[in-house]
Swiss-Prot record:
Role, per record: Catalyzes the condensation of ATP and 5-phosphoribose 1-diphosphate to form N'-(5'-phosphoribosyl)-ATP (PR-ATP). Has a crucial role in the pathway because the rate of histidine biosynthesis seems to be controlled primarily by regulation of HisG enzymatic activity.
Activity regulation summary: Feedback inhibited by histidine.
Location of this chain's protein in the cell: Cytoplasm
Record-given protein name: ATP phosphoribosyltransferase
Family matches, as InterPro entries: ATP-PRT_HisG_long (IPR020621), ATP_PRibTrfase_cat (IPR013820), ATP_PRibTrfase_CS (IPR018198), ATP_PRibTrfase_HisG (IPR001348), HisG_C (IPR013115), N-reg_PII-like_a/b (IPR011322), N-reg_PII/ATP_PRibTrfase_C (IPR015867)
Naturally occurring in which organism (per UniProt): Bifidobacterium longum subsp. infantis (strain ATCC 15697 / DSM 20088 / JCM 1222 / NCTC 11817 / S12)
Length: 283
């Protein structure tokens, strides 16, 4: 069976669980369960600490896992990113107290930086020629400055609310942009059929989240103009209607552009424009 690691807690956990459920995999019922076997789909799910997933995958104890790109980079393991998963977007930033004179990357020189991601931060500072002390903390790094342990912090920022509440402000360019991703062990062949099935299923969920099915009627004389607005993946489905002057068109379109596309189609001459959500797909 394919061994898959998922976060047991944290901001990536629920979206990861939901994505696997939408892909047809069985999840745990009891929150105390650490391992779930799904023989019908040929997988075992392991619920692990987010910080540890890349380590297990990198050492080959687990075949694939869902984690953050920042966690993968910080792990320093041999685990390989296989595909982005479209959720958990964040940036990794430096932050200093509002009243601090630290406002640029150069100001970090000689300072103390508290972070949970010490390898990521150390490597970034070395790359930019900055010498600073990196202080490892397992969480709640925002308190380190107030307690006098550090001069600034480096941490994951989603909305920035936690930093603002702690009297901190971000500065300098992000160390990196991150999102959830599927990672694989270097021992697992990229062409492994089990991985191929998982990849197709997850990509199908992503497509269903990002696209909708659009149906509309269009005069035959305006079909070319309408297809230019909604070309679809390969080509839209065009069918004749009872009225021989009209065709029906069915096409997948990006969910984020639905209203603009409906307006554009209406201007072209389309009528009866209907949008339907997708539950799953294989492209």
């Amino acid at each position: 069976m394919l061994r898959i690691a998922v976060p047991n807690k944290g901001m990536l956990s629920e979206p990861a669980w939901n994505m696997l459920a939408e892909a047809g995999y069985r999840l745990r019922i009891n929150p105390r369960q650490l391992v779930v076997q799904d023989p019908d789909n040929g997988i075992e799910l392991f619920y692990l600490r987010p910080l540890d997933i890349a380590v297990y995958v990198g050492r080959g104890a687990i075949d694939v896992g869902i984690t953050g790109q920042d966690l993968l980079k910080n792990s320093g393991t041999a685990a390989l990113e296989h595909m982005p998963l479209g959720f958990g977007a964040s940036t990794f930033r430096f932050a200093a107290p509002n009243e601090s004179p630290i406002t640029t990357l150069e100001d970090v020189q000689g300072k103390r930086v508290a972070t949970t991601f010490d390898k990521l931060v150390h490597d970034y500072l070395v790359e930019h020629g900055i010498q600073a002390e990196t202080i490892h903390l397992d969480g709640a790094v925002e308190s380190s400055v107030q307690l006098g342990v550090a001069d600034l912090i480096a941490d994951v920022v989603s909305t920035g609310t936690t930093l603002r509440n702690a009297g901190l402000r971000v500065f300098a360019e992000p160390l990196m942009h991150s999102e959830a991703c599927l990672i694989r062990s270097p021992r697992l062949n990229e062409q492994d059929p089990r991985l191929a099935v998982l990849t197709r299923r997850l990509q199908g969920v992503l497509t269903a989240h990002q696209y909708v099915l659009m149906d509309y009627d269009i005069p035959i004389s305006k079909v070319a103009a309408a297809v230019a607005v909604t070309p679809g993946f390969e080509s839209p489905t065009i069918s004749p209607l009872h009225d021989k002057q009209w065709n029906a068109v069915r096409v997948m379109v990006p969910k984020a552009k639905v209203n603009q596309l409906m307006d554009d189609l209406y201007e072209v001459g389309a009528r009866g424009i209907i949008v339907t959500a997708l539950q799953a797909s294989r492209m």
